[in-house]
Amino acid sequence: MLKMESTQQMVISVINTSFEAAVVAATSTLELMGIQYDYNEVFTRVKSKFDYVMDDSGVKNNLLGKAITIDQALNGKLGSAIRNRNWMTDSKTVAKLDEDVNKLRMILSSKGIDQKMRVLNACFSVKRIPGKSSSIIKCTRLMKDKIERGEVEVDDSYVDEKMEIDTIDWKFRYDQLEKRFESLKQRVNEKYNTWVQKAKKVNENMYSLQNVISQQQNQIADLQQYRNKLETDLQGKFSSLVSSVEWYLRSMELPDDVKTDIEQQLNSIDLINSINAIDDIESLIRNLIQDYDRTFLMLKGLLKQCNYEYTYE
């Protein structure tokens, strides 16, 4: 069995070797670029891409198919070789054509153009009709050959469903939007009116507070003026009091030293500060009462020495 499939085994070996070469080329490139990599991750990614490109492009099946044809020819089964003699000329031409086709297939697969897209593009073409939006779909000779070979099947699972077009009731949509707009407009107006009322109330309170402050300031000014007047009147009264007492003192028959002492106490009264003036007058009165008390005690003692008695009337 191994001898009969020797060509197939050789092709599989070449494909596997190509994969290993792709992995080595990828890792070597990353090392030359100074990029750190995980070998297992690179191996997995390259294998996934390599298997996809080889399978989707048909290169693997093409190589294995030719290997099977060669093995069958070596084993005396020349049917496949005879069927391919129409396009086989010589080994170099076939090898070159296969190389170019396989290269193109792999490039298309790597670009995301899979087998289904390539087959459909090869089987059909589109012809545009000048002046019209419609077009004509043409079958290529490959499609004709596939029909003749029975390689075209009808997919009964496909159901021609009628495309439903959603009809939009624009009037209903407009009415809905208009209602939403009116509702939003009403809410905005309500909030605005509420804000206006609050602003008016704040302004009224502010004006009322300003009036109260103004009235209080006027009252304070009046009280200050009245206080100044009282202060002036008191200063005048104290000055008149001092002058009157001095005049009355001079009319008394008291000794000069007593008059001088009392005048000094009168002149020491602070006539500018009313509170200090009251304190000074209080001190003067206390001193006078104290002097009167001493004089009375002296008189009382003198009466006792003279054996006199005294009474208050």
From Swiss-Prot:
Region described as RNA-binding: spans on this chain: 1-149
Keywords tagged on the record: Coiled coil, Host cytoplasm, Host-virus interaction, RNA-binding, Translation regulation
Main location group: host cell
Entry-linked InterPro entries: NSP3_N_rotavirus (IPR042519), NSP3_sf (IPR036082), Rotavirus_NSP3 (IPR002873)
CC terms in the record's Gene Ontology section: host cell cytoplasm
Record bears the keyword Calcium: no
Coiled coil region boundaries: 166-237
GO molecular function: RNA binding
Pfam (any one): Rota_NSP3
Location of region: Dimerization: 150-206
Keyword field contains Coiled coil: yes
Gene Ontology biological process terms in this record: regulation of translation
Transmembrane segments: none
Domain of life of the native organism: Viruses
Region of interest (Interaction with host ZC3H7B), residue spans: 170-234
Description of how the protein assembles with itself and partners: Homodimer. Interacts (via the coiled-coil region) with host ZC3H7B (via LD motif). Interacts with host EIF4G1.
Family assignment from sequence similarity: Belongs to the rotavirus NSP3 family.
Purpose of the protein: Plays an important role in stimulating the translation of viral mRNAs. These mRNAs are capped but not polyadenylated, instead terminating in a conserved sequence 'GACC' at the 3' that is recognized by NSP3, which competes with host PABPC1 for EIF4G1 binding. The interaction between NSP3 and host EIF4G1 stabilizes the EIF4E-EIF4G1 interaction, thereby facilitating the initiation of capped mRNA translation.
Protein name per UniProt: Non-structural protein 3
Protein species of origin: Rotavirus A (isolate RVA/Human/United States/WI61/1983/G9P1A[8])
